[in-house]
């Protein structure tokens, strides 16, 4: 399963805990058996629990790269946006990165989600199932012919 996690925002929604320097996704707020984990650590752990072989790439800004590497192992892929341009350009750049750098085929499914969802492992299990179904080619391609 190829997953792109979007982590480019400054995360000011948890102000005053988060700000431009300390984004919300890196603040350790979730209690675990060993202490606390951040949003990015939680979502990465959940993905790997569901699919240990999942290829995770985080689309982010250069200011967040060190925080990502400090909180996750270095095997996580990082696609650095040259400048912030919101969601669609981040997805376009990250999918180009998967294709051009990681060698992901044009026919392979890619799951895109935010780095900070508060979901159970069932969510990622469902995404894995959907990714597998899409990979089998049984999905109906989207057609926009009715708009012309």
Show which residues each predicted segment covers.
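Short beta-strand-to-loop acidic/aromatic patch adjacent to the donor-nucleotide binding site
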Residues: 106-115
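Residue-level signal for inorganic ion chemistry
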Residues: 40, 94, 116
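Conserved small/polar residues in nucleotide/adenosyl-binding loops
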Residues: 145-148
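Conserved donor NDP-sugar-binding/catalytic core segment of glycosyltransferases
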Residues: 133-137
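Internal, well-ordered alpha/beta segment that forms a basic, Gly-enriched binding/recognition surface
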Residues: 117, 139-143
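Acidic donor-binding/catalytic loop of UDP-sugar-dependent glycosyltransferases
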Residues: 115-129
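N-terminal glycine-rich phosphate-binding loop and ensuing alpha1 helix
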Residues: 1-69, 74-85, 124-125
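Short phosphate-binding loop-to-helix
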Residues: 73-105
């Amino acid at each position: 399963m190829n997953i792109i996690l979007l982590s480019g925002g400054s995360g000011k929604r948890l102000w005053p805990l988060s700000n431009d320097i300390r984004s919300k996704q890196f603040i350790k707020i979730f209690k675990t058996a060993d202490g606390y984990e951040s949003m990015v650590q939680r979502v990465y752990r959940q993905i790997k629990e569901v699919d240990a072989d999942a290829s995770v790439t985080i689309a982010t800004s250069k200011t967040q790269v060190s925080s990502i590497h400090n909180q996750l192992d270095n095997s996580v892929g990082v696609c650095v946006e040259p400048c912030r341009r919101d969601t669609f350009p981040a997805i376009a750049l990250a999918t180009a990165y998967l294709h051009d750098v990681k060698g992901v085929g044009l026919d392979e499914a890619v799951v895109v989600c935010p780095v900070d969802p508060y979901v159970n492992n069932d969510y990622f299990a469902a995404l894995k199932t959907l990714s597998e179904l899409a990979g089998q080619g049984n999905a109906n391609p989207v057609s926009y012919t009715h708009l012309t």
